[in-house]
Every structure is written in C-alpha cells, then in structure tokens.
Amino acid sequence: YLINHLSAQMVHQFHAASAVLWTVLAIVQSWTIHHDRISLHRRTGMAIFLLFPLFLVAGVWVIHVEATTLATGLDSATGLSDSENVELAQFGFFDPLANLGYALMFWGGLKYRYKVHLHARYMLGTIMFVIAPIVWRLLRGYVPMIHDMPFSYPFALGNLTAIGIALFLYAQAPKHGRPFLLVAGIMAAQEVLFETLGRIPAWAPMFASVSDMNLPFLLILTGITSIGIAWHGWVVGARPGAPS
C-alpha cells in the first residue's frame, strides 16, 4: 500500500538520495585506495552490495512513476500536444539505458576486481551516468538563454559533456579504457534514441503501459535481479582456486 501511494516527488528524492550515497561511497573508495588503506577499502566496499540493489530499485521505481504520469497525460485533452508528455515518453529510452549502463559497470567492477586499472575504471563508470542530468539541470537553472530553449538543447549539451568526459578519460590510458568507451557508447545511444524513436507517437502509449505492471512485484523482481548481477560478477571475477 505504501509503495503504491508514495508521491512522485518522494520517489525522485529516494532515487536522488541513493545516487548521492553511491557517489559518496565511490569517493571514499577512491580515497582509501590512494592512501593505501586497503583493508578499509575492502571493508567499506562491502556497502556496494546494499547500495547497488537500492539504487537500481530506485531507478526502476522512477521509470514506473514516469510511465504512470505519462499514462495520465495521454488520457488528458492535450495528450502528445503537451511537450511535457513528449519528454516523458522520450525518457522511456534514456532512463532504462542509464540503469542498464550502471548495472553493466557495476558487474564489470566486480568481475575485474583483481585487475586494478579495469576495476577502478568500471567503478568510476557507475557514477558517470549522473553527469548529464546534473549538467542539463544546471544549464536550465542558471543560464537564462538556455532556460528559454526547448529541453532537447540542454539535454544534448549534458549528454555531449558526459560523452566528452568519458572519451577524455579513455584517451588518458586507452589500454585500460574499455569501460569509458562502453559508457560513451551507452550515452550516445541515450541521446540518439531520445531524439529519434522517443519522439515517435506510437512509442508513448507503449512506454505508458509500463504503469500497468504491479509495482511491488516489479521492485521485488528488480531487487532479485540486482542480487543476481552482483553474485554473478563476484563469482566470475574470483581468482582460480579462491573461494567465491
């Protein structure tokens, strides 16, 4: 009952809080390893097994809220003539890809946890999917000229900034840069799909139909899936002969 009746704003705040916690953990992990606090790095790293499912569940919850809001909008008199409804439909590609990219980076970080360069880059990749939303919110909030533009402009600038950062990091060490290429590719797909398939009128009701899914079941399924991803990444990354 509580899950189904939390406001959309509270769900977004829950998602934002989980993102902040994940980012703080990434900073702590970077600090501990750079100061040779390896034991502390390993102990605090165990928090990822709590925060990863939390963040993924929050992300899927936001997608369900967006689909529900879109379904309501499509039933209104304005429908797709309302730009907000069109944007919600477009996010039906952006947000799922962000969740998939985050999960892929997390899985890679566990799989390559004994290969320092790859492990660090995969784990850094998990937080790169928040760059574009931060940039476009700052642009819309603090740059008057951009504030008056259609949303697709700051959205594209945010994505291009994030892609540029990913490619810059790749160029610093191409030998170990595969995670950043993956991040850049996923972000490019987010931008392209947002501006192409996301604008097709037939897509809007398809995404809105996600709201028909039972929310508690969807969140439980996401939680189970996240545990499976973590378990698989941990097992495939185990050293030969070491207990998994």
Language-model segments: which ranges?
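Alpha-helical membrane insertion/targeting regions
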Residues: 1-244
